[in-house]
């Protein structure tokens, strides 16, 4: 089985979030299971790594293109070099135009390299146009929605010329969406099968509450048997309390005490249990709910937050950091993130929606019990006998769940049992990788 993943980012070469993490882990596991796997992403000016150039030429209606290659963990990584991507950073305000250019270039380049896969697997809106052109060429395709909120939209009158799509695609039955070209919609309607990153999120996005305007398309896909959810896995080597160089090594609750003490020392915390947060500061992540809940949380918890994003949420947390039981580190710091996952007793994720979420899985692997809102992948991954779940997206519901966690913390046998169950959960990529390979087989033979 020859599989080609098409993505806008892939760890460790280019990463801004969870998409890059997924593409940095899933392909390698698929390769160990016998698939011949390649990953195609842009050759950014800020790319971490030095690909060997293996092809260069002019592509009709695109211009000069070059292709670089790196091999790692049994996977072939291909990097598509276009002038539009030679600037610093990954994402910019003109990304719809940039990824339209990318989308027009991919198939001609793959043909020039004689790289026609059995299955092309596109990820998120940046690959939507690639999936549409692959469909036009008769290729078999899978398309994964990692976050439906980001759809790649631009005024149709302007963007239609960028896409290279024929007139039928530029209608309401095609990729038109309220006067815009919608690249995610193009991928959804073109793919042989669509997945998203948890079974619960696959159900949620067919509703008006979570469908971001595309619920009609997604409901039709569900009724046709073309939409399903496959939970993301976790990089077991990168996130392993037994071997993590950033924390004292441990494999059980007794060993975890050293990591907790190290975190207390780092932030000058008192003896109250520690509620950790590692998150983008955004309303989607429920960080406004956390801030509103802080006046009550500090009665029972030390709260340690690592994250960056919304300026208003950042300013609010900076103000709260004057409180002796609230600590805030702005930005993203990989080593500190590991220390918070390991050293916290509980971990808060009050997300309004969460397609899959990795943080709750990391926390449980480190024996830190999640307090989560019942949405998306948080429902699929946090068992009620391990973590603490709440439904309404309100500060009051978050506080109540944290009170339940504190009560469990005071019951030593209950807490120890929950931690043991958390650390025994299997969040490896092996299961999801096998599910994707089985899906590819169905797509190819169907």
Curated annotation (Swiss-Prot):
Gene3D superfamilies noted in UniProt: Glycogen Phosphorylase B
Recorded metabolic or biological pathway in which this protein acts: Glycan biosynthesis; glycogen biosynthesis
Role this protein plays: Synthesizes alpha-1,4-glucan chains using ADP-glucose.
Documented EC number(s): 2.4.1.21
GO biological process: glycogen biosynthetic process
One Gene Ontology term of the molecular function aspect: alpha-1,4-glucan glucosyltransferase (UDP-glucose donor) activity
Family recorded in the similarity comment: Belongs to the glycosyltransferase 1 family. Bacterial/plant glycogen synthase subfamily.
Keywords: Glycogen biosynthesis, Glycosyltransferase, Transferase
Provenance organism: Deinococcus deserti (strain DSM 17065 / CIP 109153 / LMG 22923 / VCD115)
Binding-site residues, ADP-alpha-D-glucose: 15
NCBIfam families, sorted: glgA (TIGR02095)
Pfam family, one: Glyco_trans_1_4
Keyword check for Glycosyltransferase: yes
The protein, known as: Glycogen synthase
Top-level EC class: transferase
Reaction(s) catalysed (UniProt annotation): [(1->4)-alpha-D-glucosyl](n) + ADP-alpha-D-glucose = [(1->4)-alpha-D-glucosyl](n+1) + ADP + H(+)
């Amino acid at each position: 089985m020859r599989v080609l993943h098409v993505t806008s980012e892939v760890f460790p070469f280019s990463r801004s979030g969870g998409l890059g993490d997924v593409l940095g882990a899933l392909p390698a596991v698929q390769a160990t299971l016998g698939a011949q796997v390649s990953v195609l992403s842009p050759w950014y000016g800020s790319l971490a790594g030095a690909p060997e150039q293996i092809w260069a030429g002019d592509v009709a209606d695109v211009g000069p293109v070059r292709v670089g290659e790196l091999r790692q963990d049994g996977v072939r990584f291909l990097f598509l070099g276009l002038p539009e991507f030679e600037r610093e950073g990954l994402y910019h305000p003109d990304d719809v135009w940039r990824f339209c250019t990318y989308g027009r270039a991919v198939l001609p380049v793959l043909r020039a390299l004689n790289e026609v896969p059995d299955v092309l697997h596109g990820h998120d809106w940046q690959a939507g146009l690639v999936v549409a052109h692959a469909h036009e060429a008769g290729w078999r395709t899978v398309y994964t929605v990692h976050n439906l909120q980001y759809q790649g939209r631009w005024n149709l009158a302007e963007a239609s010329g960028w896409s290279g799509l024929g007139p039928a695609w530029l209608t309401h039955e095609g990729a038109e969406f309220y006067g815009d070209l919608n690249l995610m919609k193009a991928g959804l309607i073109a793919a042989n099968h669509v997945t998203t990153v948890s079974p619960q999120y696959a159900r949620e996005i067919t509703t008006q509450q979570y469908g971001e305007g595309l619920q009609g398309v997604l409901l039709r896909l569900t009724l046709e048997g073309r939409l399903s959810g496959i939970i993301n896995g976790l990089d077991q080597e990168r996130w392993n309390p037994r071997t993590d160089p950033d924390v004292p090594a441990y494999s059980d609750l007794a060993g975890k005490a050293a990591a907790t003490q190290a975190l207390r020392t780092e932030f000058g915390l008192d003896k109250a249990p520690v509620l950790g947060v590692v998150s983008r500061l955004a309303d989607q992540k429920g960080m406004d709910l956390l801030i509103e809940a802080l006046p009550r949380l500090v009665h029972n918890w030390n709260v340690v937050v690592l994250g960056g994003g919304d300026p208003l949420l950042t300013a609010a947390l900076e103000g709260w950091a004057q409180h002796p039981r609230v600590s805030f580190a702005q930005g993203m710091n990989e080593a500190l993130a590991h220390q918070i996952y390991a050293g916290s007793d509980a971990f808060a994720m009050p997300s309004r929606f969460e397609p899959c979420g990795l943080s709750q899985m990391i926390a449980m692997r480190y024996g830190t019990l999640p307090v989560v809102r019942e949405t998306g992948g948080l429902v699929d991954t946090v068992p009620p006998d391990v973590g603490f779940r709440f439904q309404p997206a309100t500060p009051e519901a978050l506080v109540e769940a944290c009170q339940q966690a504190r009560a469990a913390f005071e019951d030593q046998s209950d807490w120890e049992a929950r931690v043991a169950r958390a650390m025994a959960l299997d969040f490896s990529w092996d299961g999801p990788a096998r599910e994707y390979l089985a899906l590819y087989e169905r797509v190819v033979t169907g």
